[in-house]
Amino acid sequence: LIGGTLLLSTLTANGQKKNTQPNILFILCDDMGYGDLGCYGQPFIRTPHIDTMANEGMRFTQAYAGSPVSAPSRASFMTGQHSGHCEVRGNKEYWKNVPIVLYGQNQEYSIVGQHPYDSDHVILPEIMKDNGYTTGMFGKWAGGYEGSRSTPDKRGIDEYYGYICQFQAHLYYPNFLNRYSKALGDTGVVRVVMDENIKYPMYGPDYQKRPQYSADMIHQKALEWLDQQDDQQPFFGILTYTL
């Protein structure tokens, strides 16, 4: 995992001061190595926008992921704990209690998520929320399974759109995504079925006919959330991409 932080202006267009706390956008990417960006010396793939951000800001040369795999690495980021102390130790899958584990039979799916974060320990979005921030997260959660004690709606997130389950996040044309939106009146995390995708099977040659590409949909939801933010209140956003 690699992360970047973007601090935005604290002045309005007419020069009047708004909130004094910086807006923060933190980006996490699965499977992006230290040497995959131009600003860290990668010579073959062009990353001009990220390189510009690095040139205008700061590069971290001794920042390390908490673990080589997804869920425990994210847990270290969220909890601030060393992976040796964190309760999440691997990408353990939790499934619904059904006789046969199914995924991909159109609307029959049983994936629900990973081991939940310990509710006795505060996590980063909760800290930001307690300090007056509006919070949003878009992409992979992997910090609890559906219905567990640790889903975005219970852990300081105001707006969420993406994958609760880290395994499902590697299926780019899924049967469903997860959503939590106070603005839409959600009282908990819900499933949003991809109506166009489920017309085609999850496996085989017809899979390529599925039109709803999750990365684009998640990215668009994040942009919409950013556009909706109030100048008078700081925001903290987490974007988690699966490359």
Positions of PLM-derived features:
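Active-site-proximal N-terminal segment of extracellular/periplasmic enzymes that hydrolyze or transfer
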Residues: K17-M58, W141
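Formylglycine-dependent
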Residues: G90-Y133, W141-G237, Y241-L243
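Solvent-exposed loop/turn segments at secondary-structure junctions
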Residues: D31-Y34, R59, G66-A71, S83-G84, ...
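Short, structured active-site-proximal loop/turn typified by the sulfatase FGly-forming signature C/S-X-P-X-R
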Residues: P43-A75, G80-H85, G132-G136, R155-I164
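Bacterial Sec-dependent N-terminal signal peptides
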Residues: L1-N19
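Conserved catalytic-core motifs of eukaryotic protein kinase domains, centered on the activation segment
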Residues: G38-C39, V88-G90
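A generic secondary-structure micro-motif detector
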Residues: C39-Y40, Y64, G113-Q114
